[in-house]
């Protein structure tokens, strides 16, 4: 494992306006720190429990979907459907979690493959160009995520927490950068989350066994020269 550091005061300054108005606060994150949702007793006397409903875009394939006006919106719709399925089918023992999910409709769209994308484009990780691309990628995602929340609020109704204050948002929380250590393997061994690739050659230990993983973009470069 590896440690993650989170500044809870910064988190609470950035929570949705309707949660600030409701007097809700974030007291802790999940282990990997991408989930920062309010917990504890709310104004209705109910106990809130954070619920993770996540998906991650493969940024290594960014050029294939960056101009698609439906792609991000479709993923957000998928997350909304998953949340509804959980609310409707979770056992009674999960009543606090289903209550929180129903009121907040918090989801988290993240990414993986950022370093792989930079390597594919021959962009040094510590460079001005990587900063430019990083800003462009996440601004593009955020713009489409925000629009999707408003569109779904018009179509399906705003989440109750937002509706209480006349705010048209389907989701309270919209984005979350998860480590994606496992699903990045499924997606062709792309780099996990927004983290750099650990090494150009290393042993990957999984339940299926141990495997040598080599940097595919370095291999292509070595083959070329």
Please annotate each region the language model reported:
Residues 2-225:
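Long, C-terminal-biased catalytic regions of enzyme "large/alpha" subunits
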